[in-house]
Amino acid sequence: MEAPAVCLLPLLLLLWAWAPAPGRASPEALPLVNEDVKRTVDLSSHLAKVTAEVVLAHAGSSSSPRAASFLLALEPELEARLAHLGVQVKGEDEEENNLEVRETKIKGKRGRFFTVTLPVALDPGAKISVTVETVYTHVLQPYPTQITQSEKQFVVFEGNHYFYSPYPTKSQSMRVKLASRNVESYTKLGNPTRSEDLLDYGPFRDVPPYSQDTFKVHSENNSPFLTITSMTRVIEVSHWGNIAVEENVDLKHTGAVLKGPFSRYDYQRQPDSGISSIRSFKTILPAAAQDVYYRDEIGNVSTSHLLILDDSVEMEIRPRFPLFGGWKTHYIVGYNLPSYEYLYNLGDQYALKMRLVDHVFDEQVIDSLTVKIILPEGAKNIQVDSPYEISRAPDELHYTYLDTFGRPVIVAHKKNLVEQHIQDIVVHYTFNKVLMLQEPLLVVAAFYILFFTVIVYVRLDFSITKDPAAEARMKVACITEQVLTLVNKRIGLYRHFDETINRYKQSRDVSTLNSGKKSLELEHKALTSEVALLQSRLKTEGSDLCDKVSEMQKLDAQVKELVLKSAVEAERLVAGKLKKDTYIENEKLISGKRQELVTKIDHILDAL
């Protein structure tokens, strides 16, 4: 009878290990209740900002375990658009303290779920007030999707009338803040009240868990629908006192697409023309920023303005053209920072504390961000502390002046960022200060090698030959090669002028022909002068090729006369002084003579 007891012992131990400890329970199993929920849905920009003030109560009996955390849920329709989620609770000093939020999964339930750790475990019957902030991107959809320059922009937002929660809610209300008072339509659940640009829903009582009812509003919204589709931020750290920052930004207006043509005249004359377009925006740079530049593919953009304030540097960025719906632009902003404000060290231990992403414009949305942090050559034991989850790519190497084995580059990626992501990232690394002498020593060594090479070169004779005749032949060959190049350029001038004559015959624009003549005369004169100069050099060298070049010059003068004669014939044809048949016959004769002269010139060139 001993054997069955021995077999049951491992099973009992396993069950004891999986059993919940006294005073602990999973958040979804706790009897928590939302006593009161007040939601504010801010749709005044192109972002949807939802703030929920929740009074959470522990509705269990005195024997129930304490609640150390609770669950937050997001609707399946909005989960993919979530950019930021934060939970705060007011402390004793009335300051809002952020709570730890970790994503989790609930079997059999759709949507995203998060576990929020409370600062103090909640006893049965106790309550706590928390504030939940969420920011969604690309949830305000333009409708209609295309508008003309003079039309206003309307958008549609779809959400939930109820606070989506795994717990029952006793009472809840919702206030919707719109961008304007012009509202096309909105859902009427519970007879909402409307005042100017506000919609008030509720209170709704005794709402079951996971309740959903579609809330929809269609209203005017002309706020800037500006989106950074892609951004690359490069931070280059130098231990010589400077940190260089450069941002490559791809911008797009993600509002209603412009339908029809764009009128610059109407845009300047009528204040409400293109009301949803973007003329300019302000970027806030660090207060210590200096040597600021702003450029695009064309070059430096002079329409920007820089304002230095006490706590920041304000830069007004004005693209070369206003941005309408669907329009894109690309630009680069760069500046330098003193390293003593962001780089700290203790011996060989260094810590760089900078923002992963900085302010670009108000209510910013960044679809895709790539950050590259270039550390000094020789940095090792690199560690990155980020305030939120980022995707690290394999480290790279960057080579610049006087580098030997490359500078380590930290590469990080992040998608769907908003202003709440403007937080500091800390990079720890070790660096041997002796390596700071590497670059100065390389410069000294380079100059030493240069001076030594010059000394050797001056004192030694590296000439291959002392034959004067061979040197003279080399000089003549070099001059001949230059003559060939110049002659080919002159022939190219004649072909280009032939094209000008053809365009003149089609457009009948005398200015086109006159401009072509002037260009031909100037360039031909310059080329002929250079050939004459080379001819005199050949004569100085005593080469018999001088006579051939002289003959070629005479033939070229005849070719030029025939080319200009073709232009005169074309003018007579366009003016009606010459019949077309006669013009064709004359043109054939001129072309034949030109071809003969060009053939003679080619024979001379072959003989050179």
Curated annotation (Swiss-Prot):
PANTHER family reported in the protein's UniProt record: DOLICHYL-DIPHOSPHOOLIGOSACCHARIDE--PROTEIN GLYCOSYLTRANSFERASE SUBUNIT 1 (PTHR21049:SF0), RIBOPHORIN I (PTHR21049)
Expression (tissue specificity): Detected in liver (at protein level).
Organism whose genome encodes this protein: Sus scrofa (Pig)
Subcellular location: Endoplasmic reticulum membrane
Keywords carried by this UniProt record: Acetylation, Endoplasmic reticulum, Glycoprotein, Isopeptide bond, Membrane, Signal, Transmembrane, Transmembrane helix, Ubl conjugation
Subunit structure, as described in the record: Component of the oligosaccharyltransferase (OST) complex. OST exists in two different complex forms which contain common core subunits RPN1, RPN2, OST48, OST4, DAD1 and TMEM258, either STT3A or STT3B as catalytic subunits, and form-specific accessory subunits. STT3A complex assembly occurs through the formation of 3 subcomplexes. Subcomplex 1 contains RPN1 and TMEM258, subcomplex 2 contains the STT3A-specific subunits STT3A, DC2/OSTC, and KCP2 as well as the core subunit OST4, and subcomplex 3 contains RPN2, DAD1, and OST48.
GO cellular component labels: oligosaccharyltransferase complex
Lineage: Eukaryota, Metazoa, Chordata, Craniata, Vertebrata
Domain of life: Eukaryota
Family: Belongs to the OST1 family.
Transmembrane segments: 436-456
Pathway connected to this protein: Protein modification; protein glycosylation
Record topology, Lumenal segments: 25-435
Secretion signal, residue range per the UniProt entry: 1-24
Protein purpose: Subunit of the oligosaccharyl transferase (OST) complex that catalyzes the initial transfer of a defined glycan (Glc(3)Man(9)GlcNAc(2) in eukaryotes) from the lipid carrier dolichol-pyrophosphate to an asparagine residue within an Asn-X-Ser/Thr consensus motif in nascent polypeptide chains, the first step in protein N-glycosylation. N-glycosylation occurs cotranslationally and the complex associates with the Sec61 complex at the channel-forming translocon complex that mediates protein translocation across the endoplasmic reticulum (ER). All subunits are required for a maximal enzyme activity.
N6-acetyllysine found at: K188, K539
Cytoplasmic side: 457-607
Crosslink position(s): Glycyl lysine isopeptide (Lys-Gly) (interchain with G-Cter in SUMO2): K539
Glycan attachment sites: N300
Membrane topology: Single-pass type I membrane protein
GO terms under biological process: protein N-linked glycosylation via asparagine
Protein name: Dolichyl-diphosphooligosaccharide--protein glycosyltransferase subunit 1
